[in-house]
């Protein structure tokens, strides 16, 4: 992964990410490096350019820990994991969920509190189920959010390497 402080890169929490193909296409269009981080081997299409695979081992949060450690201004982190999103924002990264939700410093506190509350309710048997199934509108929202994040970073002085 290119680690120049003024370059844009995309870090992907890849184990359950439903938008990897979209990330590859957008990254190729903008000539950006992508780092796919997972707890197990993830296939990368042969035609995907500038994609690095990082397979971490160890605990369940090893991929999240790796991404948090490598988050920085100029990085776009793609994750559905709210605690990871919070850590990445603390490091100055831009954060997008696979459904297109853009996390910011001003929204992550409420999002984290809601996640923790729902976790507690599920543990107590009060709430069952999880998030809604991934839908085509989520894919579209994600593509828009990723393009917006890249444009904002370029306007802020970051560039493709």
From Swiss-Prot:
Pfam families: DUF188 (PF02639). PANTHER family: UPF0178 PROTEIN YAII (PTHR35146:SF1). Belongs to the UPF0178 family. This is UPF0178 protein BAB1_1980. It comes from Brucella abortus (strain 2308).
């Amino acid at each position: 992964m290119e680690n120049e402080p003024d370059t844009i890169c995309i870090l992907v929490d890849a184990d359950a990410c439903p938008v990897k193909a979209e990330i590859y296409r957008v990254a190729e269009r903008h000539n950006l490096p992508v780092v796919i981080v997972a707890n197990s081997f993830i296939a990368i299409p042969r035609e995907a350019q500038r994609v690095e695979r990082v397979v971490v081992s160890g605990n369940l949060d090893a991929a999240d820990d790796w991404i948090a450690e490598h988050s920085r201004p100029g990085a776009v982190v793609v994750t559905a994991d709210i605690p990871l999103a919070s850590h990445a924002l603390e490091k100055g990264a831009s954060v997008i969920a696979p459904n297109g939700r853009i996390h910011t410093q001003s929204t992550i506190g409420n999002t984290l509190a809601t996640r923790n509350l729902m976790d507690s309710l599920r543990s107590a048997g009060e709430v069952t189920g999880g998030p809604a199934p991934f839908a085509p509108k989520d894919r579209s929202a994600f593509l828009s959010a990723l393009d917006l994040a890249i444009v904002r970073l370029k306007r802020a002085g970051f560039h493709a390497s």
